[in-house]
Amino acid sequence: LYIMRLRKECKEMAISKNITITIRSTKATPSEKLFIYQGDFGIDFYFKLNEFNYSIKNTINLASNLDEGAYASVTVQCPNGDIFERDPFPIENDLLKFTITKDLTDDLSDIGKYTLQFHLYDGEGSDANRITIPPISFEVRTLLI
């Protein structure tokens, strides 16, 4: 039982970083430059929005709190120009979560600048209303060896 509990605890551990995204006019600026290295994965970036004064369900201001039941998705543009979208996920604790997965960093062609654009929804499903924030970027760098 102890080994099973220990394995479960280890599996739930993660590498994470909190970042504030400040929205001004048509520009989104992260609180710091984002980069990782080839082969890095299992990293959760948690983004907090600042100065984005829209409301979800006409009750909650995104600058201070995201409504329970709000969702987000993210469109990703890879260094080679390919674009894909991640499935919508619930917004928890006012944070947008983006996970660096192995498929983003496991190949030489993955090195370079990625662009992320988050879409916020007032609910789940195809009838949910949507607002999009300006894109931000991060870089995958090469290892020394």
Residue ranges of each PLM-predicted region?
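N-terminal assembly/attachment segments of tailed bacteriophage virion structural proteins
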Residues: 6-145
